Amino acid sequence: MSGKGKVHGGKGKSSETAKSTTSHSARAGLQFPVGRIKRYLKRTAQNKIRVGSKSAIYLTAVLEYLTAEVLELAGNAAKDLKVKRITPRHLQLAIRGDEELDNLIKATIAFGGVLPHINKALLLKVEKKKQK
């Protein structure tokens, strides 16, 4: 032994045969980070509860789906108003326009404004005046 370290060409993996690492998100076919969601779950779990990898993948998929749903509805609202940028107002219109999302998201959206609403009793009086 000359003491010059390991001899190359032995049983070690070469760069050609080494597998490239794939993220949990790529394996699950998701865009949101599964590893980060798992870390957040571990951090917020009480009494050092173990968190399974499938639970993190499932939660990530749910979050990604809800985000895509809200963005699709907000994009439609922006397209209806003939603008190319989604603003908080478009998010507000999208969320409050969908009954299920409205029940799910009870938060106030900053700079979202209010939904236009006219009481039906007021509309009836206006229509009666037009008929006369």
From Swiss-Prot:
It is found in: Nucleus; Chromosome. Its main location: nucleus. Gene3D superfamilies: Histone, subunit A. It comes from the Eukaryota. GO terms for molecular function: chromatin DNA binding; identical protein binding; protein heterodimerization activity; RNA polymerase II cis-regulatory region sequence-specific DNA binding; structural constituent of chromatin. Residues 1-11 have a biased composition (Basic residues). It holds the Pfam family Histone_H2A_C. GO terms for biological process: CENP-A eviction from euchromatin; nuclear-transcribed mRNA catabolic process, non-stop decay; regulation of transcription by RNA polymerase II; silent mating-type cassette heterochromatin formation; transcription elongation by RNA polymerase II. Residues 1-27 are annotated as: Disordered. The modification N-acetylserine is found at residue 2. InterPro entries: Histone-fold, Histone_H2A, Histone_H2A/H2B/H3, Histone_H2A_C, Histone_H2A_CS. One of its GO terms (cellular component) is euchromatin. Acetylated once deposited into chromatin. The modification N6-acetyllysine is found at residues 4, 11, 13. Keywords: Acetylation, Activator, Chromatin regulator, Chromosome, DNA-binding, Nucleosome core, Nucleus, Transcription, Transcription regulation. Variant histone H2A which can replace H2A in some nucleosomes. Nucleosomes wrap and compact DNA into chromatin, limiting DNA accessibility to the cellular machineries which require DNA as a template. Histones thereby play a central role in transcription regulation, DNA repair, DNA replication and chromosomal stability. DNA accessibility is regulated via a complex set of post-translational modifications of histones, also called histone code, and nucleosome remodeling. Belongs to the histone H2A family. The nucleosome is a histone octamer containing two molecules each of H2A, H2B, H3 and H4 assembled in one H3-H4 heterotetramer and two H2A-H2B heterodimers. The octamer wraps approximately 147 bp of DNA. H2A or its variant H2A.Z forms a heterodimer with H2B. H2A.Z associates with the VPS72/SWC2 subunit of the SWR1 chromatin remodeling complex. Also interacts with RBP1/DNA-directed RNA polymerase II largest subunit. PANTHER family: HISTONE H2A (PTHR23430). This is Histone H2A.Z. It comes from Debaryomyces hansenii (strain ATCC 36239 / CBS 767 / BCRC 21394 / JCM 1990 / NBRC 0083 / IGC 2968) (Yeast). The gene is HTZ1.
